[in-house]
Amino acid sequence: MRPYQVYVNQEALVSAPRSGPSRKAVMEFIHSLATDPHSIGDFVERDEVGRTVYVKIVGRFAITFWADHPVLEVKVTHIKPADK
């Protein structure tokens, strides 16, 4: 299987961790989506257009993403501090 391209919304990067172990863990998960685009999150939500999106908790951050399989892309739409 060909690796997918992973795109991160620039607004998501604003709230992403800037350094340290948290950033490393978040970035490793995002990179893993290229070779495992069928990855599912810890829970499922619907976005503003009704599309199913997955939310994965990585450390203290919630990463929202969805796979666009016809074009071999994964879109990361949000990276936010996870609720406690």
Each PLM stretch: what is its role?
Residues 1-5, 14, 21, 27, ...:
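Enriched for short, Lys/Arg-rich terminal
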Residues 31-57:
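A short, surface-exposed loop/turn module that caps and links secondary-structure elements
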